[in-house]
A protein has these predicted regions:
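Conserved active-site and SAM-binding loop architecture
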Residues: 1-144
């Protein structure tokens, strides 16, 4: 039986890969741009490929994975942030993850990823009178 494989976008310090390993899932690649978190994940996951900036990735070219996890930037969704929501410069990066998921599914005839997991702040539920969360749900259900 093939082990489940994980790709992590907006990886931070590698919490999703850490949880994956504890569940017998193999972290294959990660996308992160901050140097300090990358140094942490390289130490904990020396075999995991680090891909850099999510905006420069093409899901059709990434090694296919069963699970894509991501915690896209929350600054514009947070209740203590500017509340620009998904239209904000940082939080709009959510759509980059959705793009990558769609591209990978296109390249694998819908086989990969089978699961996508998004993590974010509570403000994501209420941002823009809940319309941002409605957009999130719509993006996930429109990834065929």
């Amino acid at each position: 039986m093939t082990a489940l494989r994980l790709g992590s976008l907006f990886d931070g310090i590698g919490v999703f890969p850490l949880a994956a390993v504890r569940c017998g899932i193999e972290p294959v690649w990660a996308s992160e741009i901050e140097k300090a978190p990358i140094s942490i994940t390289k130490r904990h996951f020396p075999d995991m490929e680090h891909l850099g900036d999510v905006t420069k990735l093409d899901g059709r070219e990434l090694p296919p994975v069963h699970i894509i996890t991501f915690g896209s930037p929350c600054q514009n969704l947070s209740q203590i942030g500017n509340r620009k929501g998904l239209a904000g410069e940082k939080s709009s990066l959510f759509f980059q993850a959705i793009r990558i998921i769609r591209e990978m599914r296109e390249a694998t005839n819908g086989l990969f990823p089978a699961i996508a997991v998004w993590e974010n702040v509570m403000g994501a539920f209420s941002s823009n009178d809940r319309m941002d969360f409605k957009a999130v749900l719509g993006a996930f259900t429109d990834t065929d």
